[in-house]
Amino acid sequence: MGQLLEIWRHPIKSHGREALDSIEITAGKTLPGDRAYAVTHDNSDADGSTWVPCQNFSRGSKAPGLMAIDLAWDETQNIMTLSHPKLPDLIINPDDPADQKRFLEWETPLIPDNRAQSARLVRAVSQGMTDTDYPSITIGNMSSHRAVAQKLGQDISHLRWRCNFWLDGLGPWEEFEWVGRDIMIGDVTFEVRERCVRCLATTANPKTGVRDADTLGALETWGHREFTVYATPKTSGTLRLGDPVQLT
């Protein structure tokens, strides 16, 4: 039916991405280390203790430059290395107050002056700060991405969708038919919950942080702004690149 092509996590919400070869999945939980931290802005009082909507955070829909951040996380030492094409690399311990201050100073040039400014780097306590109020993992279909790129007439990067899992070997939009059903990736079962409604973040190039593609306009030609699906793991296990995908 298809296979697991790529695994990605985003340790700081909207601030970088990291590719993985394998990952341990726990039933009912978000992807380990995904959206484990988030950056609140000065109009929010969120502290990470409970899940709150994305409007509380600095994010790519308001600050497209954030989309070009890459991140590597050494969890053993709790050290993150962030890079951006317009900024020097930054190495921080995300739980260290002094490093949190350095991080906020580092990303300040990426936040437009007419937007709420970043205020705090907070750890998500109850669950990863995904865009759903339930623990979710985002699953994308490369065939659907190619359909959008073809509609645009542009060779756009799939990284602008900020998925956790990329699947290949499927038909375009096949993932939409999975909503309300279970799929297996390797030996792990997931409940596909709903489609993901997309925002302006996807219009920004993940290499440059510049808006350069009308992804939302392309989706609207199909009568919606939805791309990828949210799923919740029903069982635990290890996923690896190349694992098969099938409906159950």
Locate predicted features.
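Metal-cofactor-dependent catalytic cores
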Residues: 1-248
